[in-house]
């Protein structure tokens, strides 16, 4: 053990859509990440929020995270926290930074759809094509039950349709107006914003990174192909990790909705926030948190090492 990742303030890892701290109380969402950081001296807490819910509103993930932040501060005696959010967890972290700025030292977002996800738009469009409207009700009921089952605390505060709406490009534009951040560039610019923000007299350090394993290939008859640059020929990840091929398929849908390069669910442009560490990691959306179970393509970087290096970066910044 050493003090490489021993930050001044505790670190809170904030999960995304469909997440929990431990799936069914067995498998860590942030696979192998909490224990790695702890072995390098970090105080790390893992939030457990609704897997399917919006970020704002009284039942939202934002208020759940705010309550958890206050618990961590009470338990540790610290005055602030460093928030690290994956996927929707980055939007949730921004909520807390906006409404309780004095409790936050930094916000880091990993594969976060700050501008929404073209795949969420696609799913919403597909559900709209059902004239009965039953499919969205049935799917939502199923997903809500799934969310409760996999949640380590069997959290019943699940609303799949609210979660889907939250992640659309239209709804995130509204969210960004309601919870603005200096870390965001101008809408539609595919640029990031400032590396720091001051909210109510409190300074926040802002960082992001994301995977762009899914890249567009040639266009034939108006349909653009997609390739997964994280995997090699006959890559074991295609066999042992079912999410690998699934996220190539969703990434292809995104590319054909003009997302550009992406991680299967979030485009490079959508992930940009604060100081961008990199957008060239050969990761899909789950590789970013070392899932499934640590399996990744032959070309993929080690996400555990990237997060460890970043927590050391926070330490060197004095937070």
UniProtKB/Swiss-Prot annotation:
Transmembrane portions of the chain: none
Q: What class of enzyme is it?
A: hydrolase
Catalysed reaction(s)? a triacylglycerol + H2O = a diacylglycerol + a fatty acid + H(+)
Q: Where in the cell is it found?
A: Secreted
Q: Which UniProt keywords apply?
A: Calcium, Disulfide bond, Hydrolase, Lipid degradation, Lipid metabolism, Metal-binding, Secreted
Keyword Metal-binding listed: yes
Q: Identify the cofactor(s).
A: Ca(2+)
Keyword presence, Disulfide bond: yes
- What EC numbers are recorded for this enzyme? 3.1.1.3
Biotech / industrial applications: Found to be superior in improving overall detergency.
Q: Detail which positions bind substrate.
A: 17, 88
What Gene Ontology biological process does one annotation of this record name?
lipid catabolic process
Residue ranges of every copy of the AB hydrolase-1 domain listed in the record: 10-288
- Where, by residue number, is the active site? 87, 263, 285
Q: Cross-referenced PROSITE patterns, in alphabetical order?
A: LIPASE_SER
Q: List the disulfide bonds.
A: 190-269
Record's GO cellular component, any one? extracellular region
Supply one GO molecular-function term: triacylglycerol lipase activity
Quote the record's binding site residues for Ca(2+).
241, 287, 291, 295
In Pfam terms, one family for this protein is Abhydrolase_1
Q: Which family does it belong to?
A: Belongs to the AB hydrolase superfamily. Pseudomonas lipase family.
Summarizing the function annotation, the protein's role is: Catalyzes the hydrolysis of triacylglycerol.
Q: What is the protein's quaternary organization?
A: Monomer. Interacts with lipase-specific foldase Lif.
Tell me the protein's name.
Answer: Triacylglycerol lipase
| Species, as recorded | Pseudarthrobacter phenanthrenivorans (Arthrobacter phenanthrenivorans)
* Phylogenetic lineage: Bacteria, Bacillati, Actinomycetota, Actinomycetes, Micrococcales
């Amino acid at each position: 053990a050493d003090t490489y990742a021993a930050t001044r303030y505790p670190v809170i890892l904030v999960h995304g859509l469909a997440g929990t701290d431990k799936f069914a109380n067995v498998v860590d969402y942030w696979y192998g990440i909490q224990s790695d950081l702890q072995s390098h001296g970090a105080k790390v807490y893992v939030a457990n929020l609704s897997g399917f819910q919006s970020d704002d509103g009284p039942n939202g993930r934002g208020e759940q995270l705010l309550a958890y932040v206050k618990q961590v501060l009470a338990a540790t005696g610290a005055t602030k926290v460093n928030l690290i959010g994956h996927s929707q967890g980055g939007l949730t972290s921004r909520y807390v930074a906006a409404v309780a700025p004095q409790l936050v030292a930094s916000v880091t977002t990993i594969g976060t759809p700050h501008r929404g996800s073209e795949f969420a738009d696609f799913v919403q469009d597909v559900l709209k094509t059902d004239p009965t409207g039953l499919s969205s009700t049935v799917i939502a009921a199923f997903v809500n039950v799934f969310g409760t089952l996999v949640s380590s605390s069997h959290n019943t505060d699940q609303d799949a349709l609210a979660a889907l709406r939250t992640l659309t490009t239209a709804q995130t534009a509204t969210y960004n107006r309601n919870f603005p951040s200096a870390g965001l560039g101008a809408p539609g610019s595919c640029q990031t914003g400032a590396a720091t923000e001051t909210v109510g007299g409190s300074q926040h350090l802002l960082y992001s990174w994301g995977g762009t394993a899914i890249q567009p290939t040639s266009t034939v008859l108006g349909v653009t192909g997609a390739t997964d640059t994280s995997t090699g020929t006959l890559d074991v990840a295609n066999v042992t990790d079912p999410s690998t091929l699934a996220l190539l398929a969703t990434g292809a849908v995104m590319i054909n909705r003009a997302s550009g390069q992406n991680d299967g669910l979030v485009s490079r442009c959508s992930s940009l926030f604060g100081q961008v560490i990199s957008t060239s990691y050969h990761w899909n959306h789950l590789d970013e948190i070392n899932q499934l179970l640590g399996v990744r393509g032959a070309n993929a970087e080690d996400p555990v090492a990237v997060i460890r290096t970043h927590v050391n970066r926070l330490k060197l910044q004095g937070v």
